[in-house]
């Protein structure tokens, strides 16, 4: 008889664990952050002019959020 509980998704997730980010991750993060900042800055200015009030997040926070969301997607692919 075989044990079907050995390779369940819960056990597989625990076996891989959380990997610490490496230097390559930080390089990609920095490049994406530098690319996202000008776009976020222009978007922030347009939003400020259009709505006549400051957005909740500033341009750097917005670029940081975008880089934080995009970089892990590169390594999952």
Curated annotation (Swiss-Prot):
Would I find Phosphoprotein among this entry's keywords?
Answer: no
- Provide this UniProt record's keywords sorted from A to Z: Bacteriochlorophyll biosynthesis, Chlorophyll biosynthesis, Photosynthesis
Per its UniProt record, what Pfam families does this chain match?
PufQ (PF05398)
Which is a GO BP term held by this UniProt record?
photosynthesis
Q: Which parts of the chain span the membrane according to its record?
A: none
Q: What does this protein do?
A: Required for bacteriochlorophyll biosynthesis. Directly involved in the assembly of both the B875 and B800-850 pigment-protein complexes.
Q: Can you tell me which family this protein belongs to? A: Belongs to the PufQ family.
Record's protein name: Protein PufQ
Provide the species name: Cereibacter sphaeroides (strain ATCC 17023 / DSM 158 / JCM 6121 / CCUG 31486 / LMG 2827 / NBRC 12203 / NCIMB 8253 / ATH 2.4.1.)
Report the gene name: pufQ
